[in-house]
From Swiss-Prot:
Modified residues (Phosphothreonine): 1010
The keyword Metal-binding is assigned to this record: yes
UniProt name for this protein: Myosin light chain kinase, smooth muscle
Entry keyword annotation includes ATP-binding: yes
Calmodulin-binding as annotated region, ranges: 26-41, 943-1006
Phylogenetic placement of the source organism: Eukaryota, Metazoa, Chordata, Craniata, Vertebrata
Organism name: Oryctolagus cuniculus
Record's catalysed reaction(s): L-seryl-[myosin light chain] + ATP = O-phospho-L-seryl-[myosin light chain] + ADP + H(+); L-threonyl-[myosin light chain] + ATP = O-phospho-L-threonyl-[myosin light chain] + ADP + H(+)
Positions of the Protein kinase domain: 696-951
Subunit-structure text: All isoforms including Telokin bind calmodulin. Interacts with SVIL. Interacts with CTTN; this interaction is reduced during thrombin-induced endothelial cell (EC) contraction but is promoted by the barrier-protective agonist sphingosine 1-phosphate (S1P) within lamellipodia. A complex made of ABL1, CTTN and MYLK regulates cortical actin-based cytoskeletal rearrangement critical to sphingosine 1-phosphate (S1P)-mediated endothelial cell (EC) barrier enhancement. Binds to NAA10/ARD1 and PTK2B/PYK2.
Composition skew (Pro residues), residue ranges: 43-55, 459-472
């Protein structure tokens, strides 16, 4: 007999004490167990049944009663139910009851069902599975529970409701289509509601199923008004009443009880076949008690399911009707908030149900997402996902999934957090609240597939510890041809995101027409589309992330053909069929030394340019010219990378018809008999009110150096040509030095000394207008191919040098910078010279004891290195060195480096052993020997030099034996290398522990470095090393040291680089020492000290470690006082944060 026959004998439940309920709880029987034991008798074809009476009770009220109910028509289901009338049923889950089960509908408050779970009345609904192994719902003992409907073994009996994990929750009691669903509790009209069990008479109970007609079938259990609903599970509001247990599809709810064949009574839970009914409910073992799902989870699920269902009126048929079209999208699996480590994979998933299928749109912070190579959007059936292989900070924010079809749209969202700290291995993963889509296949009895279970994702590999940026790969210095494409690529490593910045001379490089910068996670590339001269320089790649920074540098040299020779070629010494053509060198050699010059000629007959000859010097003797033609000349410069454009064209020139005279005779006349041209000597003061352009036309540039630039000037009033020397003078100290030099030159009016004729001061420039000397440096003139070097020429040069220096000394002045670069030839043909550059000259008259610490190592006297008082004899030592080189092409003291050179000078060791002196006269050797005396008192003075037998020789009649110039050429090549690649820097700028006091060196007018001597060069002589720690008395305003820019506190990450920068002012140049926690710092690979001549000082600490966390002090000291500035370096070490897992668990 159908169990519903018992409903006719339903009596009002009797209240039982709490103790009795605890005693009898093992005999509770779940009503679904009763259904499982029933056979499948056949029933006649259902007839139309009359509408149910208002008093028809809900069958679940029977299960909540405390007594057995007699069966109708003499049959009883007491044995099937196995219930004692005096026993009270327990709630699902063995939770203690605070009252008896309430009636399902229209019952009084005291008769409503108590919460299903293990909660007290005042508590909200606990998860279905928040208790120990659930007891059967009826009053039967566990061993006496009803058999399942299908002839299954006891092991296949119904498992306790909810005895699975959250992802394995029971399938809803009604997994059928909307037409067959249990109506929401209380969502039908009063006429259709089931009256509560307690308010009905026995005669109003349900008729047996077999006798019922189709019209008399039970209405869905839940078709009552809100007031008649099952009380909420817990203290939930009516809107939170018992919904279908799981995420059932709307089309899978229970069939109507009536009007069905016996075998079809109460369709199985879910989509199971008749023989497999209620399998989803029963297939979990008691030991699989699940962890509770939170209150909020159930709430969301309940509300989800309510929104997913659509109410339909009318009774159900035997077969399930098809789903209604136009179902609004619903999210059966919603997005969950996610927290991932930077660099980990980010995966967001949700499941959307809709008919027809919805169009899915993803947004991040309101911006629509599209599939890229980094972000992958996918939709497989109802499963939608967003996948990002490596999450970055910009991927954090609010993600929203919007589903849209013909019905109203639906959406769900979640927050994604990307953190950069490594996640703890023991940290609890965020709880997964989503569920996977259910299988479309029917479950198999006795297997775990009865309920679709979402498996936990495999544990992710812990992310690598965050690291500061590194540059594991970077190009070496490069030399490229002009016009070539240049690509500088730096590979980067470390924790992303890493910002890459290219800089040149501390200025950031921006994309332009010629330069492109491309950054990626792999590195950064700087591309120069076509290299040009202005692209030369040092390029720095700076990489930074949140943990620190790192930089690397590369020097780029763009080589090209040289610039054309400056100025206009000049024809001189014009004879009957020859002339001497001279010109200036190129203003820029193209990054490679000019190897030769190509001379081109044009005549008035052929009227075309042709190459005449190739020479290495800046002058050439043109022969075989015809007197009836006019000639023009131009010159090209040649280096290893090509030939320059031609220079300006010379003026038209015609050769004379007078007979050619011997060259030597003419030179003798021009040198010995020719009188010095009269010079307009002037006393010059600096003009600060007018500009140089007011009086002179500024033409082409003749040269440049560290001091500034030299331009060709043409005096507007007279048309005379002068040289304008433009000095850079930014500070007041620099502007004071130039007038001092002009003041000395005002006293030096002599034919062998260059003259200053005017001076102007303009903003950052001071301009000196000087007498022009166009013959070039003395030693450059000597190695010219058309110049024959003999001892006779050497005597002529040394005589002029001695005359000029003698005049300087008579004025009480010492030059202190005599060297080949400061001896200039007046023209390209004769032997007349002039001394230039009086920037380091000092007055000895009334100066007392004067000590200096500057000079060029190869030509400086021992007393300068020893920091002893100087005298006029200091210049005589330099004259002796110049004479030694002039006659032999060898340098007496030059070593492989500056230290060796200084050691040789201080020891005054030299000799004439080389074969170069085999052809030199004894008088010449004696002259040199009397100048290169270590004791300056034993040296010849200028007057004695001019009276020496060697300089007294008659140059007209003496034998002119030609000397080899090969050694001189080698010497000049070595000197050129030293000037460009190994120039000595100013004293006070090089030292590992401290900066040594002294004067800043500067280049002479010809570009040769004039540099003070560093302590490193003096380490070979212990007796003089202390001399360089003393202050130097100079004719400059003395200033106490101070910092115009101080160092600042730094905070860096272990493994990166730190840099302290400051700027130091003061004179004499301060001694600078760096300290780390009161300990002086010695320069090494770890600690690098950089100091330029402008006073900028830097301490660079590479590969910072924890030991570098300290206070750093820069101290500057000179004779007037001292100054310090201090900053702190904070080093952050990389440590994994503790307690992170606990924080995540709390969340």
């Amino acid at each position: 007999m159908d169990f519903r026959a018992n409903l006719q004998r339903q009596v009002k439940p009797k209240t039982v004490s709490e103790e009795e309920r605890k005693v009898h709880s093992p005999q509770q029987v779940d009503f679904r167990s009763v259904l499982a034991k029933k056979g499948t008798p056949k029933t006649p074809v259902p007839e139309k049944a009359p509408p149910p009476k208002p008093a028809t009770p809900d069958f679940r009220s029977v299960l909540g009663s405390k007594k057995k109910l007699p069966a109708e028509n003499g049959s009883s289901n007491a044995e099937a139910l196995n219930v004692k009338a005096t026993e009270s049923p327990k709630l699902v889950g063995n939770a203690p009851l605070s009252g008896s089960l309430k009636p399902v509908a229209n019952a009084k408050p005291a008769e409503t069902l108590k919460p299903v779970a293990n909660t007290k009345p005042a508590e909200t609904l606990k998860p279905v599975a928040n208790a120990e192994t659930l007891k059967p719902m009826g009053n039967a003992k566990p061993a006496e529970s009803s058999k399942p409907v299908g002839n299954t073994k006891p092991a296949e009996t119904l498992k306790p409701v909810g005895n699975t994990k959250p992802a394995e929750t029971l399938k809803p009691v009604g997994n059928i289509k909307p037409a067959e669903t249990l109506k929401p509790v209380g969502n039908i009209k009063p006429a259709e509601t089931l009256k509560p069990v307690g308010n009905t008479k026995p005669t109003e109970t349900l008729k047996p199923v077999a006798n019922a007609k189709s019209a008399e079938t039970l209405k869905p259990i839940a078709n009552t008004k809100p007031a008649e609903t099952l009380k909420p599970v817990g203290n939930a509001k009516p809107a939170e009443t018992l919904k279908p247990v799981g995420n059932a599809k709307p089309a899978e709810t229970l069939k109507p009880v009536g009007n069905a064949k016996p075998a079809e009574t109460l369709k199985p839970v879910g989509n199971a076949k008749p023989a497999e009914t209620l399998k989803a409910v029963a297939n979990a073992k008691p030991a699989e008690t699940p962890k509770p799902a939170g209150k909020e989870e159930l709430k969301k699920e309940v509300q989800n399911d309510v929104n997913c269902k659509r109410e339909k009126a009318g009774a159900a048929d035997n077969e399930k009707p098809p789903a209604s079209p136009g179902t609004a999208p619903t999210f059966k699996e919603k997005l969950q908030d996610v927290r991932v480590a930077e660099g980990e994979k980010l995966l967001l998933q949700c499941q959307v149900s809709s008919e027809p299928p919805a169009t899915i749109t993803w947004t991040l912070n309101g911006k629509t997402l599209k599939t890229t190579k980094f972000v992958i959007l996918s939709q497989e059936g109802s499963l939608c996902s967003v996948s990002i292989e490596k999450a970055l900070p910009e991927d954090r924010g609010l993600y929203k999934c919007v589903a849209k079809n013909a019905a109203p749209e639906a959406e769900c969202s979640c927050h994604v957090t990307v953190h950069d700290a490594p996640a703890s291995e023991n940290a609890k993963a965020p709880e997964m609240k989503s569920r996977r889509p259910k299988s479309s296949l029917p479950p198999v009895l006795g297997t775990e597939s009865d309920a679709t279970v979402k498996k936990k994702p495999a544990p992710k590999t812990p992310p690598k510890a965050a690291t500061p940026p590194q540059i594991p790969q970077f190009p070496e210095d490069q030399k490229v041809r002009a016009g070539e494409r240049v690509e500088l690529f730096g590979k980067v490593a470390g924790t992303q995101p890493i910002t890459c910045t290219w800089m040149k001379f501390r200025k950031q490089i921006q994309d332009s027409e010629h330069i492109k910068v491309e950054n990626s996670e792999a590195g950064s590339k700087l591309t120069i589309l076509a290299a040009r001269q202005e692209h030369c320089g040092c390029y720095t790649l700076l990489v930074e992330n949140k943990l620190g920074s790192r930089q690397a540098q590369v020097n780029l040299t763009v080589v090209d053909k040289p610039d054309p020779p400056a100025g206009t070629p000049c024809a001189s010494d014009i004879r009957s069929s020859s002339l001497t053509l001279s010109w200036y060198g190129s203003s820029y050699d193209g990054g490679s030394a000019v190897q030769s010059y190509s001379v081109e000629i044009w005549d008035s007959v052929d009227k075309m340019w042709t190459e005449l000859a190739t020479c290495r010097s800046t002058s050439f003797n043109v022969r075989d010219l015809l007197p009836d033609r006019e000639y023009k000349f131009r010159v090209r410069a040649i280096n290893v990378y090509g030939t320059s454009e031609p220079s300006q064209e010379s003026e038209l020139t015609t050769v004379g018809e007078k007979p050619e005279e011997p060259k030597d005779e003419v030179e003798e006349v021009s040198d010995d008999d020719e009188k010095e041209p009269e010079v307009d000597y002037r006393t010059v003061t600096v003009n600060t009110e007018q500009k140089v352009s007011d009086f002179y036309d500024i033409e082409e540039r003749l040269g440049s150096g560290k001091f500034g630039q030299v331009f060709r000037l043409v005096e507007k009033k007279t048309g005379k040509i002068w040289a304008g020397k433009f000095f850079k003078a930014y500070s007041a100290k620099e502007k004071e030095n130039i007038p001092a030099e002009i003041g000395i030159m005002n006293c030096l009016h002599h034919p062998k000394l260059v003259q200053c004729v005017d001076a102007f001061e303009e903003k950052a420039n001071i301009v000196m207008v000087l007498e022009i000397v166009s013959g070039g440096e003395l030693f450059e003139r000597i190695i010219d191919e058309d110049f024959e070097l003999t001892e006779r020429e050497c005597i002529k040069y040394m005589r002029q040098i001695s005359e000029g220096v003698e005049y300087i000394h008579k004025q009480g002045i010492v030059h202190l910078d005599l060297k080949p670069e400061n001896i200039m030839c007046v023209n390209k043909t004769g032997t007349r010279i002039k001394l230039i550059d009086f920037g380091l000259a000092r007055r000895l008259e009334n100066a007392g004891s004067l000590k200096v610490l500057f000079g060029t190592p190869e030509f400086v006297a021992p007393e300068v290195i020893n920091y002893e008082p100087i005298s006029y004899a200091t210049d005589m030592w330099s004259i002796g060195v110049i004479c030694y080189i002039l006659v032999s092409g060898l340098s007496p003291f030059m070593g492989d480096n500056d230290n060796e050179t200084l050691a040789n000078v201080t020891s005054a060791t030299w000799d004439f052993d080389d074969e170069a002196f085999d052809e030199i006269s004894d008088d010449a050797k004696d002259f040199i020997s009397n100048l290169l005396k270590k004791d300056m008192k034993n040296r010849l003075d200028c007057t004695q030099c001019l009276q020496h037998p060697w300089l007294m020789k008659d140059t007209k009649n003496m034998e002119a034996k030609k000397l080899s110039k090969d050694r001189m050429k080698k010497y000049m090549a070595r000197r050129k290398w030293q000037k460009t690649g190994n120039a000595v820097r100013a004293i006070g700028r090089l030292s590992s522990m401290a900066m040594i006091s002294g004067l800043s060196g500067r280049k002479s007018s010809t570009g040769s470095p004039t540099s003070p001597l560093t302590a490193e060069r003096l380490e070979t002589e212990e007796d003089v090393s202390q001399a360089f720690l003393e202050a130097v008395a100079e004719e400059k305003p003395h200033v106490k040291p101070y910092f115009s820019k101080t160092i600042r506190d730094l905070e860096v990450v272990e493994g990166s680089a730190a840099r302290f920068d400051c700027k130091i002012e003061g004179y004499p140049d301060p001694e600078v020492v760096w300290f780390k926690d009161d300990q002086s710092i010695r320069e090494s690979r770890h600690f690098q000290i950089d100091y330029d001549e402008d006073g900028n000082c830097s301490l660079i600490i590479s590969d910072v470690c924890g030991d570098d966390d300290a206070k750093y002090t820069c101290k500057a000291v000179n004779s007037l006082g001292e100054a310090t500035c201090t900053a702190e370096l904070i080093v952050e070490t990389m440590e994994e944060g503790e307690g992170e897992g606990e924080e995540e668990e709390e969340e």
